[in-house]
Regions:
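Phosphate- and other anionic-substrate recognition elements at nucleic-acid/protein interfaces
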Residues: 1-132
């Protein structure tokens, strides 16, 4: 999107999960940033893993169709000790990415630490605030 002399970009950020999928939309224009939406999809009440994946896909598509983002930023996989949890998380990430790819939206993965640091302007202590 382009308006006058300053480029405008909408970014959909996704923190995928099978219990809670966090998401936020921002509009960046020059050096200013505007929050469009910050929310979460609660999935804890559903026991069927495949239903959760379907809901993640549908919500991601709904966000894309509503806000028409220029790109998607998604939290990259991290390595944990529980293999089953990692597989479920990987599927959630893949489903969210597939939704973006189906609409031909560029996707960039960021490490969890990089995302937390960006949200806090370099203050590690701020991670607790991001979590809330």
């Amino acid at each position: 999107m382009t308006t006058s002399n300053t480029s405008e970009k909408i970014i959909l950020g996704i923190d995928p999960g099978t219990t809670i999928m966090g998401f936020g939309l921002i509009k960046v224009k020059g050096k200013t940033m505007e929050f469009l939406q910050l929310n979460e999809l609660q999935l804890k009440k559903y026991s069927d893993h495949y239903l959760k994946l379907k809901l993640i896909f549908e919500r991601t598509i709904e966000l894309i169709d509503t806000f028409n983002p220029d790109e998607i930023a998604i939290e990259a996989p991290f390595f944990g000790k529980n293999v089953q949890s990692m597989l479920k998380l990987g599927r959630a990430q893949g489903v969210a990415m597939a939704a973006g790819l189906s609409r031909e939206i560029p996707i960039t993965e960021y490490s969890p630490k990089k995302i937390k640091m960006a949200n806090c302007s370099g203050q590690t202590i701020c991670r607790i605030q991001v979590f809330r």
